[in-house]
From Swiss-Prot:
Species: Aromatoleum aromaticum (strain DSM 19018 / LMG 30748 / EbN1)
Lineage: superkingdom: Bacteria
Biological role: Cell wall formation. Catalyzes the transfer of a GlcNAc subunit on undecaprenyl-pyrophosphoryl-MurNAc-pentapeptide (lipid intermediate I) to form undecaprenyl-pyrophosphoryl-MurNAc-(pentapeptide)GlcNAc (lipid intermediate II).
Entries under InterPro entries matching the protein: GlcNAc_MurG, Glyco_trans_28_C, GlycoTrans_28_N
Protein name from the UniProt record: UDP-N-acetylglucosamine--N-acetylmuramyl-(pentapeptide) pyrophosphoryl-undecaprenol N-acetylglucosamine transferase
One example of a Gene Ontology biological process annotation: cell wall organization
Annotated metabolic or biological route of this protein: Cell wall biogenesis; peptidoglycan biosynthesis
Documented EC number(s): 2.4.1.227
Subcellular location: Cell inner membrane
Gene Ontology molecular function: UDP-N-acetyl-D-glucosamine:N-acetylmuramoyl-L-alanyl-D-glutamyl-meso-2,6-diaminopimelyl-D-alanyl-D-alanine-diphosphoundecaprenol 4-beta-N-acetylglucosaminlytransferase activity; undecaprenyldiphospho-muramoylpentapeptide beta-N-acetylglucosaminyltransferase activity
Chief place of localization: membrane
Length: 357
């Protein structure tokens, strides 16, 4: 049985694409082991999928605090030592880095031991760890074109239910009446969207006002309910959404941030979107992610400093369903629906090459 060591953690944008690839290879009979941080989101999500785990304590490489800088050498040393021990224990046929701080010590130790290393960069701007690992990896893959010099563009893996959503022309057929608006704030909620969207909807004549579903984040749900009540606007307000595929499929327009996984899902589904990049993302990578869709007519890009209720209301009022269908169709044309399979195939090829040596 071949063994894949997946290294990913920190955010769902790293973890869920890793799960998509892991499921591909588990279906082909591979053993899956996941390297992550025991204090990260992966510690809750990964065991739910039944994978073996290998925990490495390793945090951010960047930081302004003096203490963080002073402790960096110790942080690196501990991370390298723990990763080396786990790699020797697991003896993987292939090591796959999907992003997050833990990929750095794990990837460097994989290269040191001569284990085949695949690096996948999800964002339009490569992170620090992946920029370093690209120099020692056997294969470098990317979710966006032109991210790293020697990267093969395969797209970002998305869940099977997202990739299986019907195309835009089939979904939009027979639609009439008010537009359906889906607002997605993410697991923590996007406070600026929670504040601005109800005020924008209140500016739109009730006869034209979209039917809205707004995912707020559990901690911000009560504040969102108060904001909608104050604005005199009705909406389906949710702390989280389990079935994103169905919600995407029903929406005429999605208003959201521009994380790599979100952008990949919008393309896979074929959904028109208004993207408000998180302005404090490392290297402003969310703006680059959003531009991938916006530059090709598949999305509107609205920088957060320019976001206000009046402008948002004006954009929504100007949109007709046929134009949104055109945007959705352009988004779908940019999809890489077989990204998970492509990454899995690269792992298969490296494992086969290793056995021949």
């Amino acid at each position: 049985m071949k063994t894949l060591l997946v290294m990913a953690g920190g955010t769902g944008g790293h973890i869920f694409p890793g799960v998509a690839v892991a499921e591909q290879l588990r279906g082909r009979g591979w053993r899956i082991v996941w390297m992550g941080n025991p204090d990260g989101m992966e510690a809750r999500i990964v065991p739910q999928h039944g994978y073996e785990t290998a925990w490495v304590h390793f945090g951010a490489l960047r930081g302004k605090g003096l203490l963080r800088k002073l402790l960096l050498p110790l942080n690196l040393l501990r991370g390298f030592w723990q990763a080396l021990g786990e790699l020797r224990r697991i003896r993987p046929d292939v090591v796959l880095g999907m992003g997050g701080y833990v990929t750095f010590p794990g990837g460097m130790m994989a290269a040191l031991l001569g284990r085949p290393l695949v690096v996948h960069e999800q964002n339009s701007v490569a992170g620090l760890a992946n920029r370093v690992l690209a120099g020692v990896a056997d294969r470098v893959l990317s979710g966006f074109p032109h991210t790293l010099k020697k990267a093969g563009w395969v797209g970002n893996p998305v869940r099977a239910d997202i990739a299986a959503v019907a195309p835009p022309d089939a979904r939009f057929a027979g639609r009439s009446g008010p537009l359906k608006l889906l607002v997605v704030g993410g697991s923590l909620g996007a406070a600026v969207l929670n504040d601005t969207v109800p005020k924008a909807l209140a500016r739109i004549d009730k006869a034209q006002r979209p039917i809205v579903t707004h995912q707020a984040g559990a901690k911000q749900l009560e504040a969102l309910r108060a904001a909608y009540a104050e604005a005199g606007v009705e909406g389906e307000l949710l702390p989280f959404i389990d079935d994103m595929a169905s919600r995407y499929a029903e929406a005429d327009l999605v208003v959201c941030r521009a994380g790599a996984l979100t952008v990949a899902e919008l393309a896979a589904v074929g959904a028109a979107s208004l993207l408000v990049p998180f302005p404090h993302a490392v290297d402003d990578h969310q703006t680059g992610n959003a531009q991938f869709l916006a530059d090709r007519g598949a999305a509107y890009l609205l920088p957060q400093p320019q976001l206000d209720a009046e402008r948002l209301a004006g954009i929504i009022e100007s949109l007709a369903r046929d134009h949104l269908l055109d945007m959705a169709t352009k988004a779908r044309a940019l999809a890489k629906p077989r990204a998970a399979e492509a990454v899995a195939q690269v792992c298969e090829e490296l494992a086969a090459g290793r056995k021949k040596k």
